[in-house]
């Protein structure tokens, strides 16, 4: 079991015009051969939308129950979304549905689920360092922690490794993304790590519960 509720709630910021997205998804890697014949290796279950840490904890048990029922994972969108921008994007999608009725289903599938991703709040964005399975090597992981320590990143467990999360603005003690990227590149080169084993990501979902 992987439970990141307590860590993630401390990363949330309160803004009356914004909300966070939680997606519950089945992953093929959690089902051995059951997904082998499917074209898509992920299956969407449902979304939750919360405005603050209290709302997140209020639905915690519901999220856990659904994950257990479907052997699914709950993912949390690190960057908050703007309510007005979401409504504006939804109007655009619905207009496309009316104008292109013959392609309505394709338009819906392609665009509707992606609406929140286009409607960021515009505040300081969160970035995270994705560390994959090979870093279960304790000595290597501790070496990486030492390299990342100056950036004061929050450490969050993942199914195959760990994530280090921080804000991307330089002011007020937030991280310098360019410097962080250079640090990761140097570490990869020195330790012969592949790019996908150690990545700097943005606007991504992070595992809330599994």
Language-model features, listed with the residues they occupy:
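Short amphipathic alpha-helices in soluble, non-transmembrane regions
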Residues: 143-148, 174-191
